[in-house]
């Protein structure tokens, strides 16, 4: 009888342990990604450029409350709505994004706009914090890369990213480069992009955990809920 009670208790303890272990992935996800994020600020500067792959791209910056920290987010669906009338609205149902190009470019952006650099970045001297104007330009570049990822247009990451860098640079700096192999200050657009991606593979920009959030807010005077962009946002480790 005592032996049966002992076995019953051991079985119960094992079941509890299994249940606790089963909860760990969910708990880890919850720790990395809040269940919802809120738009704090959406700013459009009225500037746009043309991308052969994406069409017209308008420059904008969006700041979200992400784990009680103001964090830049990016639109995930080119052509859908986003604007100041959505400030205070929420996005939820986070889904992890594991594409290495997206993770690298978002880590690159966050590192240079927040000043959070790895020891490797400091050692290599790639630890310059961008000013406001340059941050807008780089925001447009990373935004275009995310849109291309969602459109399935990142088969050759270095080429795709270089093409968008060329478009952004030409339109915002009023230049007329025609090929990603053209030299800018002695280095081609292709080589610049490849260098950034290679450093990302080495962990120089840090590790960026990226999630995509779906709109869960209500319709506003300017945007119907069904037409609002999903958001990609990350946390730099």
What residues fall within each predicted segment?
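Bacterial N-terminal signal peptides that target proteins for export
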Residues: 2-14
């Amino acid at each position: 009888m005592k032996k049966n009670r002992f076995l019953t208790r051991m079985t119960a303890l094992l079941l509890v342990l299994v249940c606790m272990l089963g909860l760990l992935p969910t708990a880890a996800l919850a720790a990395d990604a809040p269940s919802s994020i809120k738009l704090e600020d959406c700013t459009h500067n009225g500037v746009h450029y043309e991308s052969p792959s994406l069409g017209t791209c308008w420059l904008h910056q969006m700041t979200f409350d992400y784990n009680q920290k103001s964090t830049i987010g990016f639109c995930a669906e080119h052509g859908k709505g986003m604007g100041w009338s959505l400030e205070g609205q929420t996005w939820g149902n986070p889904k992890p994004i594991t594409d290495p190009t997206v993770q690298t470019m978002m880590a690159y952006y966050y590192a240079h706009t927040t000043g959070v650099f790895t020891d490797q970045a400091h050692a290599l001297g790639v630890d310059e914090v961008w000013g406001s104007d340059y941050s807008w330009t780089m925001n447009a570049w990373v935004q275009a890369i995310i849109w291309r990822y969602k459109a399935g247009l990142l088969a050759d990451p270095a080429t795709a990213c270089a093409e968008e860098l060329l478009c952004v640079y030409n339109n915002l700096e009023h230049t007329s480069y025609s090929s990603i192999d053209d030299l800018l200050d002695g280095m081609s657009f292709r080589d610049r992009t490849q260098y950034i991606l290679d450093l990302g593979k080495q962990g120089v920009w840090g590790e960026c955990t990226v999630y995509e959030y779906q709109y869960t807010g209500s319709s506003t005077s300017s945007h119907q809920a069904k037409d609002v962009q999903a958001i990609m946002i990350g946390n730099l480790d």
